[in-house]
Amino acid sequence: MKRRNALIAAGLAAAALAGCKTTGDIVVQQGVGITALRSVCPAVGIPEFTGDITLFSPAGSVTADAMDVTATITNVRSNCDDSGDEVFSSATFEVQAMRRNTSGARSVELPYFSSVVRGGSSVVAKRVGTVTLNFADGQARASAMGTAGAVVNRAEATLPPDIRQRITRPRRAGDNDAAVDPLTEPDIRAALARANFELLVGFQLSEDQLAYNVTR
């Protein structure tokens, strides 16, 4: 039981802390100076262990022959409007599913979450929705689309001018701080974390479902 709880905790931590690198992230060129800064648009991604869900029948079993429905979140796409004081980010994704028993038409509702995460760990907003998968009689596969959105204050997602200057200032050989990586300085790291927002989507899993994903 202790091992199982530890694995669940590890999975939850990974889901909360998982981040996604996208165009606009900080780029270090040859270890000297910073050549680009991150966008104010939230990065969009799927936290580890939350992109898959398995339903079992009977519900208490977790063996391969008891798998009823399996589903995966894929084809995540995002759009961002950063033209105003509020940054609007939206995402669409596809849920692809398979079922074991293809007899009869069937609808399956799967819950999913969309969270706005700040600094890699602080959840500032969360919404839970559902996607409905409609299997036709004799059909093993079905798919459905889901949506997510986030609104971020532009000022909160923007680095202060002094921090930007310290990060992007060219460093030349002979400078006292030429060998110092600005990203290692505590106040700069803290400012970067405060300005970092992510829009994360995944299945809203029970503890047992999360444990299964972590340990399989």
Predicted regions and their residues:
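C-terminal motif of bacterial Sec signal peptides marking the signal peptidase cleavage site
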Residues: 16-19
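Bacterial N-terminal signal peptides that target proteins for export
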Residues: 1-9
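Bacterial signal peptide processing site
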Residues: 21-24
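Post-signal peptide N-terminal segment of mature Sec-exported envelope proteins
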Residues: 29-56
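An exposed acidic His-Trp-rich patch
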Residues: 106-159
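Short, solvent-exposed beta-strand/turn "edge" segments of beta-rich domains on protein surfaces
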Residues: 61-69, 77-89, 99-106, 120-122, ...
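Intrinsically disordered, low-complexity, charge-dense segments enriched in Lys/Arg
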Residues: 10, 147-208
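Beta-strand elements of well-folded, non-transmembrane domains
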Residues: 75-82, 91-101, 112-120, 133-137, ...
